Swiss-Prot record:
Gene3D superfamilies: Formyl transferase, C-terminal domain, Formyl transferase, N-terminal domain. It comes from Paraburkholderia xenovorans (strain LB400). This is Methionyl-tRNA formyltransferase. Belongs to the Fmt family. It catalyses: L-methionyl-tRNA(fMet) + (6R)-10-formyltetrahydrofolate = N-formyl-L-methionyl-tRNA(fMet) + (6S)-5,6,7,8-tetrahydrofolate + H(+). PROSITE patterns: GART. Keywords: Protein biosynthesis, Transferase. CDD domains: FMT_core_Met-tRNA-FMT_N, Met_tRNA_FMT_C. (6S)-5,6,7,8-tetrahydrofolate binds at S121, L122, L123, P124. InterPro entries: Fmt, Formyl_trans_C, Formyl_trans_C_sf, Formyl_transf_N, Formyl_transf_N_sf, Formyl_transferase-like_C_sf, GART_AS, Met-tRNA-FMT_C. Attaches a formyl group to the free amino group of methionyl-tRNA(fMet). The formyl group appears to play a dual role in the initiator identity of N-formylmethionyl-tRNA by promoting its recognition by IF2 and preventing the misappropriation of this tRNA by the elongation apparatus. GO terms for molecular function: methionyl-tRNA formyltransferase activity. GO terms for cellular component: cytosol. Its EC number is 2.1.2.9.
């Protein structure tokens, strides 16, 4: 089926690529795709295109990669050129998903039918950069996708529609991300079909109550603080898969990445951070409340391994201790 509604798309990572693929696959014309500039990545730090750029190029879609869209920012000439390109590209609406650049009011005013954002949380909870990570870390029972009409605030626009999904006890950011990416792709296509049919989308202002912010995940957060409850640390490990991973550092300075862990059903004596049990089923570490069973680990320079395989080449032993990070 083909459509007449012309969609400029702005996005960068895999989450956004899923939405672009759905929009393009549904038959909506996409006259221009905006994505962030190529970035160095991998061991060789070679420039790599974003997932959105790769999809666009594979399907013959025009791509622009301005470093900024703010005339008053660091790249005024490139921003002015990109804004000029937007104005010169006939279109009806812009869809934005995890683009990573600020859209000033001047840009928001260009699309005749406005800018729709695909956000991976149930707004107004978890506005900001890392809503999937923070929902798992906080122990939320559910999350979802919200479509909103963009304004200049940080995820403050009026809500068009939402879809909800339960967060299971074994969900990681990776698994939840993939599920939400597909939910967002489906929801935006439904909204665009409605917009084409009626010429408008009803939107409801966000409530003032329940606002929380999902700050960007920093590498410094990876260190597990064994003084915290085991249940909290288990959520942290799930939230930080695939980035940055949980980290435990032994007293001899050996750093171990912790990719999977569950609260242990056995009591562990000893101070927080002390290894209380080492078996093929897991390494049990005492916590401030309860104990944590580590089930998937990684040595520096090694691969993620189930604990049974990890222990075949490791000397972890009962009584060893993980360092406690400096209290914040």
């Amino acid at each position: 089926m083909s459509h007449s509604l012309r969609v400029i798309f702005a996005g960068t990572p895999e989450f956004a690529a899923a939405a672009l693929a759905a929009i393009h696959g549904a038959g909506f014309p996409v006259p221009l795709v905006l994505t962030q500039p190529d970035r160095p990545a991998g061991r060789g730090m070679k420039l790599q295109a974003s997932p959105v750029k790769r999809y666009a190029q594979e399907h013959g879609l025009a791509v622009a990669q301005p470093p900024s869209l703010r005339r008053a920012g660091k790249y005024p000439e490139q921003a002015a050129a990109a804004i000029g390109q937007l104005r010169a590209t006939p279109h009806d609406v812009m869809v934005v998903a995890a683009y990573g650049l600020i859209l000033p009011q001047e840009v928001l005013d260009i699309p005749p039918l406005g800018c729709i954002n695909i956000h991976a949380s149930l707004l107004p909870r978890w506005r900001g950069a890392a809503p999937i990570h923070r929902a798992i870390e906080a122990g939320d029972a559910e999350t979802g996708i919200t479509l909103m009409q963009m304004d200049v605030g940080l995820d403050t626009g009026a809500m068009i529609s939402e879809t909800r999904t339960a967060i299971s006890g074994d969900d990681t950011t990776a698994t939840l991300h993939d599920r939400l990416a597909q939910d967002g792709a489906k929801l935006i296509v439904e909204a665009l079909v409605e917009l084409e049919r009626t010429g408008r989308l009803a939107a409801t202002p966000q409530p003032a109550e329940g606002v929380t912010y999902a700050e960007k995940i920093g590498k410094h957060e990876a260190a597990l603080d064994w003084r915290r409850p085991a249940a909290v640390l288990a959520r942290q490990v799930r939230a930080f898969d695939p980035f940055p991973g949980g980290v435990g550092t032994l007293e001899d300075g050996t750093s171990i990445k912790i990719w999977a862990a569950i609260p242990a059903d056995t009591k562990a004596g000893g101070a927080p951070g002390t290894i209380a049990e080492v078996t093929p089923e897991g390494v049990v570490v005492a916590c401030g409340e309860g104990a944590l069973r580590l089930t998937q680990l990684q040595k520096p320079g090694g691969k993620r391994l189930p604990v049974r395989e990890f222990l075949a080449g490791s000397t972890l032993a009962v009584g060893q201790r993980f360092q406690l990070p400096e209290a914040k």
